Amino acid sequence: MYYQKDESETSNIIKSPIFRDKETFLYKNRYAVFIFSSIAALGLFAYSTNYLNETPTMNSELYESYLKIPMKYGELDEYSTIDLFKQYKTNFSRSYETDDEESLRYTNFKNFLTIIDKRNEDEFIYGSGKSLHGITKFADLTEDEFKKGFLGYRPTYDTNAIVKEVDTELVNRTVVNWANIYTTAVKDQGYCGSCWAFSATEQIESDSIRMGLLTVDDALSPEQIVQCDNIDYGCEGGNTDTAFEYVMNAGGIERDSDYPYTSYYDVTGECTSDTTKYMVTVNEYYSLKDEDDMIAYTLSTGPLSVCVAASTWSSYVSGIITSCDTDVDHCVQAVGVNTDEGYWIVRNSWGTDWGLEGYIWLETGVDMCMISYDPKYTITTLV
């Protein structure tokens, strides 16, 4: 059904804290680059002004160019890097049991700083330089630890999804953000490769809210899918198609409050679902053929479950990603799109202490991070 524009709803959309305009983003990047600091909620923390004294003074001719490139962590000496690591541990409540582990995590941290520099360079070389990478809560992990614990997409070669086309000519808006309108709050999968279950659960939530079956306070249970979907692999990964199939075959899904998430630390327990507590079920699920149809659907109707290439997101801080990998390894939810400024609004499941309060922006029109690889939505009914 085509969505008719409602002025009061549009007002709520524009007021959403994650719907920031281009000028705000550029100002925050300018702040981050020039004084080497940013906001803790966006993944960076304030640096001691002593670090600025160790960098060359910028003259007026170089001022504009410095505003366009992030400061390089590789330029810090060892003393400053150690001090930075101490600050990281404080801000992200990190403590280590042994000196050996502390040494290992410090080595990982230094490697992460190198990765940040490389990704910021790639944004300028291969992209449009519209995003900023920096220190996040993942900074003391190895790349393998990050991929194992926070990604988790596994491909499926057999799907019952029905391909739908969208009439793009019916769309009469260019900007929409369904966050907090057709979505529940941002969730945190913890150190468990359960992104696929979160993406599927969030899509079932959104479609049910859109159809008037649930409210934004009715969070459903990703843990039920993690524990009870025998086709997928719990914290070792899975697929949204088979997650939707599980809910269809099981006959429904419970509320998160009835079947809470317990797999934060890579432990998948036994299935304990209770059919008497099922809220909604999936009748059918659909896929879209390309990014144009995705944009039209999102603008006119609602969010989409998507699976993407997210290995470089570990260091994302703010802005529009314009350079990305192409290996699909993570499932999330596209909750809005701004075709005027050219970006998707994507809800992740890594908590609100990552990215833009749990969200990330991806460039539109170029299949950034393979966003059009596996878009899905569902038709749900009450149990």
Language-model region placement:
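Sec-dependent, cleavable N-terminal signal peptides
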Residues: 39-44
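Short, low-complexity, Lys/Arg-enriched N-terminal segments of secretory-pathway carbohydrate enzymes
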Residues: 1-27
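Catalytic-core signature of thiol
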Residues: 29-34, 45-383
